[in-house]
């Protein structure tokens, strides 16, 4: 016990650093090196000890187990837990004892067990030297201790494999007591399941670990990195199972034998591959690995591992491990230490594993020869897998899960994760939380699930208590690991959901949670481990590969599966080998799953896993470069395994294998890089992507280094991944079919990966990769944090969905699920998935969602939740499901678009196809728009016809947009997607929009806004057909007009799909830009895209001029798309277009004019276009240009909305990239679509616009108003509005179109009506709320306003409510709407909160300007001054959208100032202003609204304000959308920075007026002098406590009223003190003392302007000089000074004492200089006072 305690203490002290090393090291090669080195040293120790295998191994067994404690002990929590649990139970003695007695009790290897017990005891005695030395060594190299222990484990394992099996079986028996003991000792120490619940489970897990696993685990933990990491992983993973099951024991015994006997070195070494492979096994079949070994033992493992390796490999492994122990002794020291040690920690943070695979590869290469042996050890494990298979048979579903970790390699890997779970969980409990996250994720999923399915593991169950308990404990622990883990950030979000989700939603979450958790783990694991994610995050991978089956299987087995997540975390190590592993695993898993798909049972799962583990070793070995041979060997072996499954589903397998492997590879890249971080991500992604893509299984693994292969295979759509990529492309609107090559790992992976995430995965799943990119776009924080943030925002599910979705989606969805589900759908058609999706949309939609992994499960799980759906592809698949159902095919097609398109596309289905994905969205938007546009204007009619659908679709779509934006926003991918933002955004938005739109809109909108929209492909759109081939490809898709459409569609789709990628590409151009730029760009780009979209749309709408302009618009928009998107040129360039269009493009009535106007508008809008550029420039610009083209008002409306949207949009835009993100998206969607439509409609004829607007707007409204629609539901306001607006819009649209010419007066007035439309747009501007609100106010503005005004008001009840829930919507509405209604007092009020927030904080201002403008301006003035107001509104609209309105800044500034001044009145004033100067105001606000809005919103939007100051015009907008704003703010935070860039780009980020206006609050501070005085007073106040109340009051009141008040009461009796600082002179009159003090201080203070220090001194000196006379003179001078000094004069009269008192102070002060005066004054004061 003492020894154990010592060891633990040492381990805790020493291993903690070790763990730190692990934690830190896993990031680089160090984990392996550092670990390897220290373990190597201990290993010799162990090796000397090793000779006495019987005795010392027994001793070493305890020692071995102790080291794991050491690592755990390393953790602060371990120590803490030691205290809590007690070092003794914690000590190797007690911990091993539970196992030793069990092995002893378990007479299977009675001698061995006894020996082992003896070993433990001997080890207890012996370990003190070893352990303390090891631990001592451990501090330097924490793994040193583990090395000896590991060799101990090796020795022990060699002798005690059977023993271990028996012991493991016995531990199961003893698990109850042992776990209790473990609970006491290991619980705290373990911290596996967060300690007592899970830890006990892992305490249970630790039991075998103690014997074998603990030796391995401890050895692994301490020396584990050298030897035991794999073994420990296996055994640790096994450990739960070993403890849990005799089968596990047997399995682990098998493994432990091989591992214990030879595993120490061999496992250490082979297990590195094994660890990677185990990680893979654990990762790929991590869950499957166990079942693979359990069930796989029978089905997969038997045919692969069990027969070949169970017996032979057992001996062979023992033998091989013995030799390998020698080989691995050095190599494992390094390899295990690095890969294994790194894997353990890397399990958590082995994302460095990508680097470590380099290390691991070198290290694994050493095991290269051993890796085959490792494979055999795998096989060895797989014979144990046979035991786990009984586990499965035993009904140990969890044991399957556990078995998954338990799977030899899986267990090695599981031990990497599970062990990290025990170890790392303990570590995280101890503060160093490396793997715990993963492990806990696994455990979270696994343990939470384990207790569920782990009925036979009573001890485990008991330790777990309930799933929930474990989950909670996990959650708690996860909280620990979350931060520390390399994946800590991920873990933070990801792990807790797993436990929580898994536990709470064990069954549901088993399915969805597996997807989510697995996905999350995939996000973590998968991201951390990419491939390992699929294999490792077998839950994820299963969710991916087996999503239907595994999702279901893991529903049944999913509880076990959550362990997969736990294991999937572990696959992070697998990331080394996981690429290959996932491939094989994907292959195998897919194979298994294929059969399993039908059988969704643990056994089939196991079968899958059996094959997978077999494959996984290869994968694990593939992790290292050297293991490529082993990988090939295993690939061959797994290939047989694969062959079996392949036989089952050769094609599916191949596809699954290819796709899943590649997906996993991508995920691996995506996942793997994630922990390492973005920097490693790309390389890692490439490497990993390259590695898995070779779908040849072994060949692919062999080609593990074939990034090109991966890309090429992906490009080739090798297997499912290719399809998956295509699918992802489709899903993401990435036309992957043609592009798989481009998109493929390299293009797609990098582009799409980044774009989609590798996009989704990347965005969420692999911030390192796509997310990093995406994060770069969005900001890494945004990528990961943002993703998480919005995921969190969206909900954990989202995050997990995001992780899962992004990743699972990307990976699972793409390959795994796609494979699994798409397999169902025939996802190969996935490119065709657009169609296939479309056709299979339902199957595939679900499947896709399922495919998207996150989709199905999550879809199922989150299906309503659009979070998952949306999230997964999630985001929009989710949305897709919601909206996606109609949009689903679209979105599926596009993933989101096609789905959407599918729905909308029903109408525009062909188009969507034709359009392809983005046609979905585009087709949705573009569909009708396209249709409209396609038909040109005729399509408008179509669009008009579609409006209902569009309205629905668009609304839904846009809503989806908004909400979908939310969703999209929700999904990093969504953001990433942009398409999703478009499609997804609103797909769910539509679905979720209603409830989620608000909430999602907040997240979604904001995210959608900024993320999806901005992210989406706005940049992509920027890339728009130009930048992005897919878009452009779609352009061809769309053909020319389509090209224009496609251009914008491209822009749209591209932006969404391609744009997403383009955003990656173009967006990549401006990653930040992508985020921000995407927001801005996205807005711009989006709008640019929409600009493009609009342009082309307009082009479609106006084939002639519009096409020209559209071309101008499109092209320019395109270039603007990139300019704008890229540079924000859109603002300028795009603005030009926008202006072009908007500017008097009359709605691009005159393209030339448009250009001219464009320039004007560019100038105007350019100004604002900088700001509005996002707004206008972005959508406004584009759309403003489009709008300007007929929608300057629209630009105003849109731009306005853009600005407003940007600003207002914040409201609608979730303001995100400026609210435009949402607004952009939303707005772009809405506005864009709507605006587009509006622009088109308005331009196209207003009717279309009306329809579009009305419908579209309604749609838009519907979208936002989806909230609104839903909110006000209002189809009324919408419909009403639509009619009103539609009519108005229509007519005005027409008028506006031409007359709108923007300018206002004419059609603008109309367009005011149009503006109603525009307002509608402006209304839209608020996005949803804006749409509605603005619409309400804006749209008919007066009518609509009235129409909507009531509705707006009503809406505002709703919008308010919308704002509440729409926040984005309502916020929009409220702000916009509020603004509108805000204009309308209700709205204003509502807006006032917003506005009050700062007048809508600028949004109100801006949106208010918008809304108010609309409402007021447009609404009120609109009727009053339709032309002007419209103009104003337009101006206003222009102001936001239409910076042209900005040109009239005079009013605008005045207004702004007025606004500023009339903070309260602001709304009213604004209303008035809006009516009169609103245009100017707006204009200024346009510039300033973006800024003011930003600023204005800024106050309201405190969160964003931080970064919002500049960009927060948008943030402001974001703020505008209260909820949205919050989300937006959150996302702003995510994207805020990017957006910040964007906003700044956007023009005056915040105008001074805007800011001041925003920060009217500062007015109080205007008295800084007063405050200074106050400060002085405060300073001197201490001296002059006594203040003459009158003087103090008067003088201070005057000089510093606050001070006077402050001091008055306190120093009321004393007149001298309070005023002294500020009003020293003032107080002179009060009393000489006071006066002198004051005078003296007055000299010092120079408080009074009247008196300079010299004057005061001169006056004071005379006073000082004339003491007596001075008294009179002083009184006089005081009076004079009072006259001279305001303070004095005021105070003298007030005091009335001056005559009498002054002499005193005079004398008191002293007659010398000011210095003596004040000194004397002080003295006298003191004396007299």
UniProtKB/Swiss-Prot annotation:
Residues 117-127, 230-245, 858-872, 1012-1021, 1389-1400, 1602-1615, 1665-1679 have a biased composition (Basic and acidic residues). Residues 1450-1542 are annotated as: Tankyrase-binding. One of its GO terms (molecular function) is ankyrin repeat binding. The modification Phosphothreonine is found at residues 131, 239, 501, 833, 979, 1282, 1518, 1563. A motif (Nuclear localization signal) lies at residues 1629-1635, 1723-1729. It comes from the Eukaryota. It is found in: Nucleus; Cytoplasm, Cytoskeleton; Chromosome. Binds to the ANK repeat domain of TNKS1 and TNKS2. This is 182 kDa tankyrase-1-binding protein. The gene is TNKS1BP1.
